[in-house]
Design a protein with these regions (language model features):
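Active-site region of glycoside hydrolase catalytic domains
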Residues: 1-169, 187-210
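Aromatic-rich peripheral "rim/lid" segments of glycoside hydrolase catalytic domains that contact
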Residues: 107, 170-264
């Protein structure tokens, strides 16, 4: 813990006077109990992973308080200090305000593919895999996250610091590109409830023709999962996110956004 705090202090001293420095995030994805126990069986080296566990909220709050105290003493007042929600967005309430923290932001990572994961592990898997059910399911899942973001944002500005359009519907859809566009519009409209949103921008695996965005969709070497929607360059090249199309224009995406009122 002390080592991590020292690294944060060194980073703050190095970059505090950079005019382009918007913020520093204290820690990336401190895992919750539910997330850890849902993925703990995927360790590549079981012996090395032995003893690992989730990050308790009490410990995380203590670390965040110490990190804030050290960083705020170094950074300029206008520089934002960002804290990840630890996959517990609604557990924070007004804690940051009560802790006396100024100019802070809460980062939450919202992946549709992760939201739907538990549903496909249960007995209703075949039902959910039928494409006609997935748009309804996505409206429900993303809508619930939008409500959670709005609730948390009453106490602290919320940043959707990671998201992407990966989902199980598009690869099974007759029109893959249109499915991705609908999922994009649905999420962008929901994440507008936050102070900002950042698409995952790193390429996880190259396609069959590196740099072209064409060829066979890249696959996760661990489980064969689809990675094509994680690469922002590929997504943008294929038009799966469209800058010239308002993401609240429901007329072009009736199957997912049909229940939204225009301009919401």
């Amino acid at each position: 813990m002390e080592y991590a705090l020292n690294v944060l202090e060194r980073l703050a001293r190095r970059y505090r006077d950079e005019p382009t420095l918007h913020s520093i995030e204290v820690l990336n994805e401190p895992v919750s109990w539910s997330v850890f126990h849902g993925t703990s069986n995927t360790a590549k080296d079981v012996r090395e992973a032995s003893g690992s566990t989730h990050v308790p909220l009490r410990f995380l709050k203590r670390f965040y308080r110490d990190a804030y105290t050290r960083l705020r003493a170094i950074l300029r007042p206008e520089t934002i200090i960002v804290f990840h929600d630890g996959f517990r967005l609604l557990r924070w309430g007004d804690w940051f305000r009560r802790a006396g923290m100024r100019n802070v932001m809460l980062d939450t990572h919202q992946y549709l593919i992760a939201m739907e994961e538990p549903l496909f592990a249960g007995p209703a898997r075949r039902l959910y895999l039928q494409s006609r059910h997935l748009p309804w399911l996505y409206r429900m899942l993303v809508g619930a996250r939008e409500i959670a973001i709005r609730s948390a944002a009453r106490h602290i500005p919320v940043l959707v610091g990671e998201w992407c359009v990966e989902n199980r519907w598009a690869p099974r859809s007759r029109n893959r590109a249109d499915a991705y566009r609908q999922v994009s519009r649905l999420q962008r409209a929901a994440w507008d409830a936050s102070a900002g949103q950042v698409y995952w921008s790193y390429q996880l695996a190259r396609s069959a023709k590196p740099g072209s965005g064409e060829g066979k969709p890249p696959r996760d070497p661990r489980n064969g999962g689809n990675l094509e929607a994680w690469d922002l360059t590929r997504v943008w090249r294929h038009g799966w996110i469209q800058a010239d199309a308002p993401h609240d224009d429901v007329a072009s995406a009736p199957s997912i956004n049909g229940n939204r009122s225009k301009g919401h």
